[in-house]
Amino acid sequence: METSMRYTSNSKSMKIHAKEKVPVNSKTHLQLHGELDTGTGAPSYFCAMIRHFFPEASTGLGVGLHYDKRQKLRCLVRGKKEFPVRADKRVTFNIKGRCDIDQDLNQKNPKGAAEFAWNIMDFKEDQDVRIKVGYEMFDKVPYMQIRENNWTLNANMKGKWNLRYDL
């Protein structure tokens, strides 16, 4: 099980996130993940999703259900396509999108982004770094991510940010 501690610019409490991937076959897994709000002591959300990877097309697709304490039960579909910029795939151009559909079949929170990702292995001894720079199409905002081993910082040009530490 993967666990992390998360803190965002619009939250007053730390969140504990847990994720488990249960293999179905070599290209498909069931992904279960949820979050506990340490301020309230209650779960923030829970999600179950079937994810499939198409290696010949460098593409991933996921379909699942998401329960949120505010927006209740939703169905979601997400996809990502990766285009290598370099032959070693350390620099990629990614297109990704997500669509949530509520119980009344209304589309909620659409997301779509184009980004460049640069993976720097052994930046220093035992230190890997990933830098992402992208543009979120629906929110119309540039964003960036810097990841160093267990630490991840995400920020956008509207002043929103979040920090994650993988345990």
Swiss-Prot record:
Chloroplast intermembrane-side segments: 32-55, 82-87, 121-127, 153-158
Residues assigned to the Cytoplasmic compartment are: 1-21, 66-71, 98-110, 138-142
Q: Where in the cell is it found?
A: Plastid, Etioplast membrane; Plastid, Chloroplast outer membrane
Q: Which GO terms describe its molecular function?
A: porin activity; voltage-gated monoatomic anion channel activity
Q: Tell me what topology the record assigns in the membrane.
A: Multi-pass membrane protein
Keyword DNA repair appears in the UniProt entry: no
Q: Which GO terms describe its cellular component?
A: chloroplast envelope; chloroplast outer membrane; etioplast membrane; mitochondrion; pore complex
Family annotation (InterPro entries):
OEP21 (IPR034575)
Membrane-spanning ranges: 22-31, 56-65, 72-81, 88-97, 111-120, 128-137, 143-152, 159-167
Tell me the leader sequence span.
Answer: none
GO BP annotation list? regulation of monoatomic anion transport
Quick check: keyword Transmembrane in the entry?
yes
| Keywords carried by this UniProt record | Chloroplast, Ion transport, Membrane, Plastid, Plastid outer membrane, Porin, Transmembrane, Transmembrane beta strand, Transport
Instruction: Summarize the protein's role.
Output: Voltage-dependent rectifying anion channel that facilitates the translocation between chloroplast and cytoplasm of phosphorylated carbohydrates such as triosephosphate, 3-phosphoglycerate and inorganic phosphate (Pi) depending of ATP to triosephosphate ratio in the plastidial intermembrane space; in high triosephosphate/ATP conditions (e.g. photosynthesis), export of triosphosphate from chloroplast (outward rectifying channels), but in high ATP/triosephosphate conditions (e.g. dark phase), import of phosphosolutes (inward rectifying channels).
Q: Which family does it belong to?
A: Belongs to the plastid outer envelope porin OEP21 (TC 1.B.29) family.
Provide the protein name. Answer: Outer envelope pore protein 21B, chloroplastic
